[in-house]
Amino acid sequence: DVSTSMLAEDLKPNRLEAAKDVAAEFINGRPNDNIGITLFAGETFTQCPLTVDHAVLLDMIHNIKCGLIEDGTAVGMGIANAVTRLKDSKAKSKVIILLTDGTNNKGDISPLTAAEIAKSFGIRVYTIGVGTNGMAPYPYPVGNTVQYVNMPVEIDEKTLTQIAGTTDGNYFRATSNSK
């Protein structure tokens, strides 16, 4: 998820950087696996197709930033794009790790429909809700400075749990950098 809400600073330095750390840690723990990167906000694209060149993956993760694509949260489209990349893989285990801080509000495919599609190809989806509970400080540019506005944290845990359940994955909640 590269929507601008990932810039909220309830995780340090912000949600996006915390999610990138999780992704890098995952890649480093799977040295022989084919791994790819699909980004989404209001739309989705494949940043890196499946590869075992983890140095390239880590470099690409390092360069991920918000604002690369239209803003919003198209969870279903992100899953569908990842499924397109994984569906023909001969790997015995096909997994999508979905990191998001929001509620689906864009895209032509609902998250639950995308989960059903993933399931039909034997792909498990592990979902991770990124962010604290309550309110989170969000940077808001004002001229040459940045002010912070407390915004409500709106993670659709029900849908993320349903996505994981439909695909035999699991849902996790990351409320701090250590969890």
For each of these PLM feature ranges, what is it?
Residues D1, D101:
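Conserved acidic
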Residues V2-K94, I109:
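Membrane-embedded segments
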Residues I35, I123, G169:
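Short, conserved active-site loop motifs that form the nucleotide-linked donor/cofactor pocket
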Residues T38, I97, Y126-I128, F172:
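Hydrophobic/aromatic beta-strand patches that form the interior of the parallel beta-sheet core
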Residues A41-F45, G131-T132, S178:
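Short glycine-enriched loops at secondary-structure junctions
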Residues E70, T84, V95, G102-T166:
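VWA/integrin I-like adhesion module and closely mimicked acidic/polar interface patches used
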Residues N170-K179:
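Juxtamembrane amphipathic/hinge helix adjacent to a transmembrane helix
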